C-alpha cells in the first residue's frame, strides 16, 4: 500500500483578510506580511513546492477530494451555524466566530478542506492506504 497525500490548490485561496496577527488593520495597527495572520497559504504552498522539487509528491498517492457534503458537515456543526457561514460567505465574507475571518467563497473552501480530511481518514479506514496526510486550509480550529 501507500501513503496518501490529499491537497487541493483551492484551499490555498482561503483569504482571512488583512490583519496584524489577531488585530484588524487600521488606525495605529500596521499590516504585516502575508496578511498578518499566523495561518497563511504561504507556509502550505512552500511545503507543497518543496515536496514537488524533491520528488516526494511523486512517491505518494497524491490526490484531491470532493468537498464535504452538507450532511457530513452537520455531523459536527448545527444547521444554523452552516446557514450563517454560507450566508456571510455569499455576501462577501466576514467573521463567523472569534478570530475566524474569511472572504467570499470561504464556505466552499472550508467544505473542500473538510472533504480532504474526511477522504484521507476514509481511505486509511477502508484499507486503501497505510496512512495519509491532508494539507488543507482553513484548518477549522475556530469552528463551533
Please name every model-derived segment.
Residues 1-144:
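HDAC/HDAC-like amidohydrolase catalytic core signature
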